[in-house]
């Protein structure tokens, strides 16, 4: 991991690598990543990301000089690489006016308080509108559990869930109709079976929103949108 490498940089020489490839490159401006890039002297540094806009507005041109290839979600949908989107906005009665912004997004603790009492409405929206395998993004573990209690067969996945792989397998097989997660399936997740995404976690971050919605855009047999 990036964190492990940062602690072990002294095991390498700065010129050990001619090429460095960075996945999830929207993180490249973070301190840990910069420590790695500043240490090594590769001939080329190449980054890949589906979400180049950081929530803290830090520009990636502090790390990368040129964009050599670019495609967006619209292009992917129009050219048959991603599913089309049918979007519906549901008013469930929460108020974010008192929630402060921290690091480019809503303060987590305050957001959790603001979303208190919305589980019934979220579960109702699922029952009325969800199609097929559904992935719900919750603000907190507490909210995820409250939502899951109200949906038959729903399973909660958090950072501490140990049998995550088997849950995803059962979900893909159609044995689990709905997964409610708390900031787990935003990055590095490939579950093409997802047909409906419910964003029950308000955000000011373009990147995070695109990541959540993007979980439902992978192609899968029998899935139209």
Language-model segments: residues:
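Conserved interdomain linker/interface between the two RecA-like ATPase lobes of SF2 helicase motors
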Residues: 67-135
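Conserved helix/coil segment N-terminal to the catalytic DExD/H
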Residues: 1-19, 30-35
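SF2 helicase motor core recognition
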Residues: 7-11, 80, 179-197, 213-218
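Conserved helicase ATPase core of P-loop NTP-dependent helicases/translocases
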Residues: 135, 143-147, 153-187
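Structural recognition of the conserved hydrophobic beta-strand(s) that form the central parallel beta-sheet
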Residues: 1, 43-50, 178-181
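Post-DEXD/H (motif II) to motif III coupling segment of the RecA-like Helicase ATP-binding lobe
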Residues: 19, 26-87
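Conserved segment of the helicase C-terminal RecA-like domain
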Residues: 202-211, 215-225
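Conserved Walker B
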Residues: 20, 24-26, 144, 185, ...
């Amino acid at each position: 991991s990036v964190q492990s490498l940062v602690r072990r940089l002294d095991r390498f020489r700065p010129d050990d690598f001619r090429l460095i490839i960075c996945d999830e490159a929207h993180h490249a401006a973070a301190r840990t990543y910069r420590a790695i890039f500043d240490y090594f002297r590769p001939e080329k540094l190449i980054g890949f990301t589906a979400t180049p806009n950081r929530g803290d507005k830090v520009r990636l041109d502090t790390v990368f000089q040129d964009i050599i290839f670019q495609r967006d979600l619209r292009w992917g949908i129009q050219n048959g690489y991603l599913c089309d989107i049918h979007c519906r906005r549901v008013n469930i009665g929460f108020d974010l006016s008192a929630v402060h912004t921290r690091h480019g997004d809503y303060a987590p603790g305050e957001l959790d308080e603001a979303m208190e009492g919305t589980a019934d409405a979220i579960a109702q929206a699922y029952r009325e509108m969800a199609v097929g395998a559904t992935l719900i993004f919750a603000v907190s573990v507490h909210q995820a559990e409250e939502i899951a209690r109200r949906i038959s067969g729903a399973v909660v996945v958090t950072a501490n869930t140990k049998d995550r792989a088997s849950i995803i397998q059962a979900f893909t097989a159609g044995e689990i109709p709905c997964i409610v997660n708390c900031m787990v399936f935003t990055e590095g997740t490939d579950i093409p079976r997802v047909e409906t995404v419910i964003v029950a976690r308000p955000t000011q971050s373009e990147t995070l929103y695109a990541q959540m919605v993007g979980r439902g855009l992978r192609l899968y047999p029998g899935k139209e949108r």
